[in-house]
Amino acid sequence: MADFEDRVSDEEKVRIAAKFITHAPPGEFNEVFNDVRLLLNNDNLLREGAAHAFAQYNMDQFTPVKIEGYDDQVLITEHGDLGNSRFLDPRNQISFKFDHLRKEASDPQPEDVDGGLKSWRESCDSALRAYVKDHYSNGFCTVYAKTIDGQQTIIACIESHQFQPKNFWNGRWRSEWKFTITPPSAQVVGVLKIQVHYYEDGNVQLVSHKDVQDSVTVSNEVQTTKEFIKIIESAENEYQTAISENYQTMSDTTFKALRRQLPVTRTKIDWNKILSYKIGKEMQNA
């Protein structure tokens, strides 16, 4: 083991550690980080070499964070990344510093966030908040307004999670939606992602995503926003229904085909009895 460690460079160790961290299941970053920390056995190397992995994980997962003094949580995403560990909160028109290890926000500062698209962003943000409140028991959203390649663009991000470590499962829903403000119509592009990890007496992960394309009539802010939210609601309902139906189908067919529900004898095995028989026999022979 020591010989192997000597032959692996620090750069390679960090690369492997970063890979583990970026693939940590939702809600299990700390557990994976602590395991990697023990394996690497070099805190300075881990913090300095894998810092990009911490940031990438939080942005990929749409990690929500509460900023002291403000009511609503904001999502950590690539769209709000200002560099130097600072992120944008468009709703409150501030930027803040984010600690990717502690998952804490600090140093809020005023920030110009809308790029001349304030009414569009606020209209979409208000409607999306209402939608998320209706459809997600623990959901958060952040809406950005940006000019990308000369086109005025609205980007809407949604995150919802349930972390149940005592019941051995964690899960997260993420969706991202974009459209450009280009009358008379614009293409809507969305990506929906579900990731669930179940680890009681086993290790099963569901990782699924779906790409969506649609179009929206671009008129005024209010009417366009209504159409935009309808597209989101329809696509997300359809995706959730499809996932549920596929799960049921897999339970009824695929999983049953993988193993017998009963052994060839057609009777269930009482492992506790077998264990007690074995122990009793060994005691008799002693």
From Swiss-Prot:
Disulfide bridge partners, by residue number: none
> Matching InterPro entries, A to Z?
CapZ_alpha, CapZ_alpha/beta, CapZ_alpha/beta_2, CapZ_alpha_1, F-actin_cap_asu_CS
Q: What is its main location?
A: cytoplasm
Positions carrying N-acetylalanine are A2
Which compartments does it reside in?
Cytoplasm, Cytoskeleton
Q: Which UniProt keywords apply?
A: Acetylation, Actin capping, Actin-binding, Cytoplasm, Cytoskeleton, Phosphoprotein
Q: Which GO terms describe its cellular component?
A: brush border; cell-cell junction; cortical cytoskeleton; cytosol; F-actin capping protein complex; membrane; WASH complex
Residues modified as N6-acetyllysine: K19, K97
User: Domain of life here?
Assistant: Eukaryota
Protein's GO biological process:
barbed-end actin filament capping; cell junction assembly
One molecular function GO term is:
actin binding
Give all Phosphoserine modified positions. S9
Q: Which Pfam families match?
A: F-actin_cap_A (PF01267)
The UniProt function text for this chain reads:
F-actin-capping proteins bind in a Ca(2+)-independent manner to the fast growing ends of actin filaments (barbed end) thereby blocking the exchange of subunits at these ends. Unlike other capping proteins (such as gelsolin and severin), these proteins do not sever actin filaments. May play a role in the formation of epithelial cell junctions. Forms, with CAPZB, the barbed end of the fast growing ends of actin filaments in the dynactin complex and stabilizes dynactin structure.
Give the family per the record.
Belongs to the F-actin-capping protein alpha subunit family.
Per UniProt, subunit arrangement is: Component of the F-actin capping complex, composed of a heterodimer of an alpha and a beta subunit. Subunit of dynactin, a multiprotein complex part of a tripartite complex with dynein and a adapter, such as BICDL1, BICD2 or HOOK3. The dynactin complex is built around ACTR1A/ACTB filament and consists of an actin-related filament composed of a shoulder domain, a pointed end and a barbed end. Its length is defined by its flexible shoulder domain. The soulder is composed of 2 DCTN1 subunits, 4 DCTN2 and 2 DCTN3.
- The protein's name in its UniProt record: F-actin-capping protein subunit alpha-1
Which gene is annotated as encoding this protein in its UniProt record?
Answer: Capza1
